[in-house]
Design a protein with these regions (language model features):
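A short, well-ordered alpha-helix in the C-terminal region of glycosyltransferases
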Residues: 317, 324, 331-346, 355-358
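N-terminal strand-loop element at the rim of the active site
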Residues: 7-21, 25-66, 76-77, 158-163, ...
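Donor nucleotide-sugar binding/catalytic pocket of nucleotide-sugar-dependent glycosyltransferases
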Residues: 52-54, 134-183
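Conserved donor-binding/catalytic core segment of Leloir-type glycosyltransferases
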Residues: 5-6, 152, 187-214, 220-221
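Nucleotide-activated donor-binding/catalytic signature segment of Leloir-type glycosyltransferases, i.e.
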Residues: 221-224, 230-255
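Acidic donor-binding loop of glycosyltransferase active sites
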Residues: 256-272, 287
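Conserved acidic donor-binding segment of nucleotide-sugar-dependent glycosyltransferases
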Residues: 303-304, 308-315, 324-329
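Membrane-proximal helix-turn-helix segments that form the acceptor-binding/catalytic region
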Residues: 25, 72-79, 99-102, 109, ...
Length: 363
């Protein structure tokens, strides 16, 4: 009997790479009947890559609307689906997950972030209450998640916390897919640009990246959404090529122009043990990386010889790394080849999806 599955989210777009492209499509390709529910500016239903997608017309203008209006709409639609397994992706949906569990459904919580550590540096939460809010959020997350059928998360570090609460915790790392990156673009010795693709925020080190690219006099190709006027103004530097928010094909085109990819997140509780998907996308594209010198990242990057690690707060150090790879293109090419090999052999979604399918078949 084919199991009917409903994925739902309030915080992610309906075409989210992890949720739709990786998890939902992988499940559909393995015989599950998949429906994905999300909120957006327009209502539509379609079937894409064997996944039924339902976008609810619930524009999300602020967090309050997401927490209440969107959550209510998603829950109502999820009940209509009457699935065997429900799989949700946002902590504010934990109470809904437990309600579905009490209706006799199998329920999976997919924790994309280390929530309590993430809250501890959220700029929209006043500093004076961040610690108590983080403490309360951890207690609430623990209470609800421990009562569900399974927990999926993105890193071994987060798994350690959930292992204390639940016997069925699975790590599905957010690695890139070989199907999306079947081969690396041909390396051209005249690649003269570097790139950063992702959210453009201070905590992700974008200001230091902009300064370092200017100091090294190298063109920087950027794609992603910014969250402040200061960052928007800084994108007008002469050496910056800002592409805006782009589709997946454009991302790959940007990669093909560059000799290195930057992922220099600033130190933060939720960054130090993270596995940023852009790091693995650079690897998939055969790009050497310039990355933050966090212990786990440094260990992996040095083991596979796929790039350079820097202090992400030190503009001069980032600039020196950029110049080093720019002046040593053959070495950059070799590091990129090492990165691609590590991706194909170890760090790809096709390996991770096997754990996802095994979990589903066990429920």
């Amino acid at each position: 009997m084919i199991k009917k599955v409903c994925h739902f989210t309030t915080a992610h777009p309906i075409d989210d790479v992890r949720i739709f492209t990786k998890e939902c499509v992988s499940l559909a390709n393995n015989g599950f009947d998949i429906t994905l529910i999300a909120c957006g500016d327009i209502a539509f239903e379609d079937i894409k890559k064997r996944v039924k997608r339902i976008s609810l017309n619930v524009p999300i203008k602020n967090r309050r609307q997401r927490f209440f209006k969107c959550s209510k709409a998603v829950y109502k639609k999820a009940l209509e689906i009457d699935a065997d397994i429900y799989h949700f992706h946002d902590p504010e949906l934990l109470p809904i997950g437990l309600r579905l569990k009490r209706k006799g459904k199998k329920v999976i919580y997919d924790s994309h972030e280390d929530l309590p550590r993430q809250i501890s540096y959220k700029s929209w939460i006043p500093v004076i209450i961040r610690k108590p809010v983080a403490f309360i959020s951890e207690k609430v997350e623990n209470f609800y998640s421990s009562r569900l059928d399974a927990i999926i998360t993105v890193s071994d570090h987060i798994k350690l916390r959930f292992d204390k609460l639940h016997s069925n915790v699975v790590v599905c790392h957010n690695y890139a897919s070989i199907k999306e990156f079947p081969e690396a673009p041909e390396w051209r010795i005249n690649r003269d640009n570097i790139c950063y693709v992702g959210g453009l925020s201070k905590i992700r080190g974008i200001l230091e990246i902009l300064e370092a690219s200017k100091a090294s006099n190298v063109k920087l190709e950027i794609a992603g959404a910014f969250n402040s006027q200061e960052i928007e103004e800084r994108l007008n530097q002469n050496n910056i090529i800002y592409h805006g928010v782009v589709n997946r094909d454009k991302v790959k085109m940007i990669f093909s122009n560059c000799f290195a990819g930057l992922v220099t997140l600033l130190p933060a509780p939720n960054h130090n043990n993270a596995n940023p998907n852009k790091l693995f996308e650079y690897m998939a594209a055969g790009l050497p990386v310039i990355a933050s010198d966090f212990e786990g990242w440094k260990k992996m990057i040095e083991k596979y010889n796929i790039g350079l690690c820097v202090d992400p707060t030190n503009v001069e150090e980032i600039a020196k790394a950029i110049l080093f790879l720019n002046h040593n293109k053959e070495l950059a090419k070799q590091m990129g080849e090492n990165a691609r090999k590590a991706f194909v052999n170890t760090f790809n979604w096709q390996i991770e999806e096997k754990k996802l399918i095994e979990l589903y078949k066990s429920l």
